[in-house]
Amino acid sequence: MNSSHSFNQTYSASVHSLGSTRGRQGSCHRAPSVHGGAGGVRISLSFTTPGCLPPGGSWGSGRSSPLLGGNGKATMQNLNDRLATYLEKVRALEEANSKLETRILRWHQEREPSHRKDYSQYEENISRLQEQIVDGKMANAHIVVLIDNARMAVDDFNLKFENEHSLKKDLEIEVEGLRKTLDDLTIVTTDLEQEVEGMRKELILMKKRHEQEMEENHLPSDFKVSVKVDTTPGEDLIKVLEDMRQEYELIIKKKHQELDTWFREQSAAMAQEVASPAPVQGNQSDIHELRRTFQALEIDLQAQHSRKTALENMLTETRARYSCRLQDMQQIISHYEEELIQLRQDLERQNNEHKVLLGIKTHLEKEIATYRRLLEGDTEGTMDGSESRLKGSEASTIKAITQESVNGRIVLSQVNEIQKHI
């Protein structure tokens, strides 16, 4: 059908152009137009009658015609016959085409059901179910997001709890260290107090002994040695450290209780939210509240850190102050020890000199008595006695040994020999 259709179009166009060319040569009679062909294609055919021929009876007079050649009538007759045959074929094809279309239409009518089912209700149900599925997916995705947020919040709370727990352990360790330091300082303070008390007792005993020796040696009553220790009462370090320890314990206990209560409340709230998801606004308000709580806890933690730092600085200053005081006391004690050693050496030297002087005094008194007896006239007995005494005195000498000792060691030793005539 398509091939015949294209052929008809081509042939009609060529014949039409031929007729139009001839029409320009002169006036002629045209046959009526013939319409036909498959698909309603118009075919126009124009041909000339013998009256339209030029003078001479043929197209070939005067010039040659490339289409008609010699006999134009026979050629036109041949063309008309061929056209008639072609038109008959076209009509036959049109009839066959119409029959085929009728058969196709009948076949379609036979195959089509008499009653079509109405699927509009099902389509509405399907669209509604699809919308419900989409809504369910959105709600499920929202719930998944809420669950993820809740898990992240729980992880954050667990991390914060672990951090607070580790901080608590660190504070406990520091408090334990401060307690040990306090105990050590208490022991050191007690030892120092005992040493100072012992040295005071020793100083009192030395004063008494010195007074006794001075009384024995007939020293003037106004010769006295007074040693005074000026100690300013300082702060009670044990009480300060005990107050600090109690304050730290109260802070740690309070923070532990607050964190435990807060964690339980948040865990219960998160469990309820996971079991039955609350609205988004409620979750947002809870998140804001938790953030505010977290910020408040951070501020409180920073305050506690600063307070701890201040207490540590105070403890360091207290240690430094008391160490300076202890050094001063040790220097004072060392100075008094040196003075006591010097005083002992002076007393021993004076005692030795006193003994030497007493011996000299005794010998002089004896010599004076002898001279008196000689002057009184007892010449014989006394001269013999005096000569014997003078002979004995020539060989008698008195040695005075003076020693200076520091911390039990002899530093300087002097020997003084005094000859006495008895």
Curated annotation (Swiss-Prot):
Cross-referenced SMART domains: Filament (SM01391)
Annotated Polar residues bias: 1-24
Transmembrane spans: none
GO cellular component, as recorded: intermediate filament
Alphabetical UniProt keywords: Coiled coil, Intermediate filament, Keratin
Xref: PANTHER family: INTERMEDIATE FILAMENT, KERATIN, TYPE I CYTOSKELETAL 23
Pfam families the record matches: Filament
Binding partners and assembly: Heterotetramer of two type I and two type II keratins.
Protein name: Keratin, type I cytoskeletal 23
Region Rod-like helical tail, annotated ranges: 379-422
